[in-house]
A protein has these predicted regions:
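Hydrophilic extracytoplasmic domains
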Residues: 252-338
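Structural motif
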Residues: 89-101, 133-139, 173-180, 212-219, ...
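A generic tandem-repeat structural signature
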Residues: 99-188
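Short beta-strand elements that form the blades of beta-propeller/WD-repeat-like
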Residues: 76-92, 124-130, 165-170, 204-210, ...
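Repeated scaffold domains used in trafficking and secretory/extracellular systems
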Residues: 48-74, 111-124, 152-163, 192-203, ...
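A short beta-strand motif characteristic of beta-propeller blades
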Residues: 40-44, 104-112, 142-150, 182-190, ...
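Sequence/structural signature of beta-propeller modules
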Residues: 1-80, 86-95, 308-338
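Solenoidal tandem-repeat scaffolds enriched in leucines and small polar residues
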Residues: 148-253, 257-258
Length: 338
């Protein structure tokens, strides 16, 4: 349990306070991620298949209570997350098995054909859901998915601008479209070719990688390819960043983790992945989720700092970092609002 928390603390501190412009880690300072980093004591949920997508809403689902909303059961304060299950083959190809919401510790399948989700970063409880037959929106009161808009595309990835109501979707043909007018209009983003995955940072810079598994960023200056990263990697993943990260996203390339900056530069992190999570949910910064071997693990750094988890109180690493973590905790989610 201590080890997995160390991952989260180190990632937060290195990215939120020094990632932009920070030097690469020294090899002597590498943290090697092994199976020991995933203890049973942190398991939040166990699925029937691998969890390949985790989404932690930064809105009223997790940051506020709305007494006007009724729900099938009272919330227990454990947080609401969305996740996708899939059967993975040896090459990492996905046979999707459904999109779920985890609420009050109970997983509910919302869409059999669900692929991804993205939350609105405001005081609503809006979460958009991507499926093989178009878009849906989460109905909090009835804990179900409602059809949204008129699109019928087979969507494998979805993102939303922080500063507007614009959605971006990636189809099964690996084409990217900008979706507007409440899900009724789509415009192809011609500058993005063969997108396999797409992520936005909180300044709405777009990061994606193509068939060659090399990442790109689209900013005010146009499309930039990141240089100096490993060539011909076997597997790569873009991670939705914690909200404290500015103009930067984490990127996993085989067994290494990099920070990709919006200006087209990158830094190697201090992590080497001997084993890798199948999904990451780090948006909330201090309450993070990782998926590994069909389990969802929760790391609650806030609880650690206030001493609710006794085992951590005497750990020198956390005691040394406590003031920095508390500083991160004071950064308001409201800063995300346009």
């Amino acid at each position: 349990m201590i080890i997995l928390t160390t991952i989260t603390v180190t990632l937060l501190l290195s990215s939120a306070t020094t990632a932009i412009g920070a030097p690469s880690s020294n090899e002597d300072e590498l943290t090697i991620i092994t199976e020991d980093f995933f203890p049973d004591s942190l398991i939040k949920y166990t699925g029937a298949y691998d969890i390949v997508q985790l989404v932690v809403p930064l809105n009223a689902l997790n940051f506020a209570k709305d007494s006007d909303d009724s729900s099938p059961e009272s919330d227990d304060g454990t947080g609401v997350i969305f996740f996708v299950e899939a059967e993975l083959d040896d090459k990492g190809n996905k046979d999707y098995k459904g999109l779920y919401v985890l609420r009050n510790g109970k997983g509910t399948k919302l869409l059999e054909n669900g692929r991804d989700a993205v939350a609105v970063n405001d005081d609503s409880k809006t979460v958009y859901l991507a499926a093989s037959d178009g878009l849906y929106v989460y109905n909090y009161k009835e804990n179900k998915a409602d059809k949204y808009g008129t699109l019928t595309d087979n969507i494998i990835d979805i993102e939303k601008e922080n500063s507007s109501n614009v959605l971006y979707i990636v189809t099964d043909k690996h084409e990217v479209y900008k979706v507007t007018d409440e899900g009724t209009k789509k415009t192809k983003v011609e500058k993005i070719k063969n997108a396999q995955q797409l992520v936005l940072d909180y300044s709405d810079n777009i990061y994606y990688y193509g068939e060659d598994k090399q990442p790109y960023v689209i900013n005010a200056e146009g499309v930039k390819k990141f240089v100096g990263l490993p060539e011909n990697p076997t597997s790569v993943t873009l991670i939705k960043p914690p909200f404290v990260m500015e103009d930067c996203v984490p990127f996993v390339s085989d067994d290494k983790v990099y920070y990709l900056n919006a200006n087209g530069t990158s830094q190697l992190s201090e992590f080497q992945l001997k084993v890798k999570p199948t999904a990451y949910g780090m948006e909330a910064a201090l309450i993070d989720y990782f998926a590994y071997k069909k389990h969802i693990y929760e790391v609650n750094l806030l609880a650690i700092i206030v001493g609710e988890i006794k085992d951590f109180v005497e750990v020198n690493f956390l005691k040394d970092k406590a003031s920095s973590i508390q500083s991160i905790a004071t950064r308001s989610r409201s800063g995300l609002h346009p």
